[in-house]
Curated annotation (Swiss-Prot):
Catalytic activity from the UniProt record: RNA(n) + a ribonucleoside 5'-triphosphate = RNA(n+1) + diphosphate
Region of interest: Alpha N-terminal domain (alpha-NTD): 1-233
A Pfam short name: RNA_pol_L
Keywords per UniProt: DNA-directed RNA polymerase, Nucleotidyltransferase, Transcription, Transferase
Notes on the domains: The N-terminal domain is essential for RNAP assembly and basal transcription, whereas the C-terminal domain is involved in interaction with transcriptional regulators and with upstream promoter elements.
Name of the protein described by the UniProt record: DNA-directed RNA polymerase subunit alpha
Lineage start: Bacteria, Pseudomonadati, Pseudomonadota, Alphaproteobacteria, Hyphomicrobiales
Amino acid sequence: MIQKNWQELIKPNKVDFITHGSRTHATVVAEPLERGFGLTLGNALRRVLLSSLRGAAVTAVQIDGVLHEFSSIPGVREDVTDIVLNIKEIAIRMEGEGPKRMVVRKEGPGVVTAGDIQTVGDVEILNPEHVICTLDEGAEIRMEFTVNTGKGYVPADRNRAEDAPIGLIPVDSLYSPVRKVSYKIENTREGQVLDYDKLTLNIETNGSVTGEDAVAYAARILQDQLSIFVNFEEPQKEAPQEQVAELAFNPVLLKKVDELELSVRSANCLKTDNIVYIGDLIQKTEAEMLRTPNFGRKSLNEIKEVLASMGLHLGMEIPAWPPENIEDLAKRYEDQY
């Protein structure tokens, strides 16, 4: 009885990840969801994506000949304040733990970019074309960066160590690999029910993590945080040994096709063709299904999609099907699918 609180809620039968051919942009679509769960999950995932994923960022910079951030450097067009702002935008991926050191040294004339930075083995610059400063003829600059890992946003004053040497300028650190997240809730249908939710998440990252992985990490964080509120153990229901021995196939094949919440046309076509159980259905080939009266390509695609969500497909061979006592077996294994 207790388990029905969560077991009978509808869950998405598919989650689509669309990358748009880019590592930094992704769209995630999940449907169907119970009414209201699109907003609940979308808002929770968005907040965790923006605040709680770990990443790497510059925490401090030391520039030769510069004592503080309100200085200017001869032959450098930008003042130090602008240089620090540009440094904050460097996107970094770091596999290990910090802090690590990076150095850039360049002579003018020319532009100093993130790609000019000399990195250590497990540190990668993800936006090498990003401009840090511009040098005039005869100008020279050397900068040493401190890189660390963390989460969220850390202001510069918290990156200032008490024993920091003179000239070490702390930098605001945006550790989060996720830059933007938006979500949209739309109505969708499942079978004959029209008021389920469809959740669409649009994610932009700095490239250190893909949108698909970012959503997975955020969901895992939520799962871990919510588990503390579960104050009971779920009873484990084991099938008797003699029942297990009777079956040479997945018990889900004993489920009746009229429980699949198919469209009326698809359900009627299956009934016309005397297809009662999923086990009957999956042994049919696509060609056989299309020969069924009033059964078209749209119905075929609908059935293929439902079967795929269960790990099944048309044209499967099932040994020992149908079993002689199929109705009794269907009742006995009803709780297992």
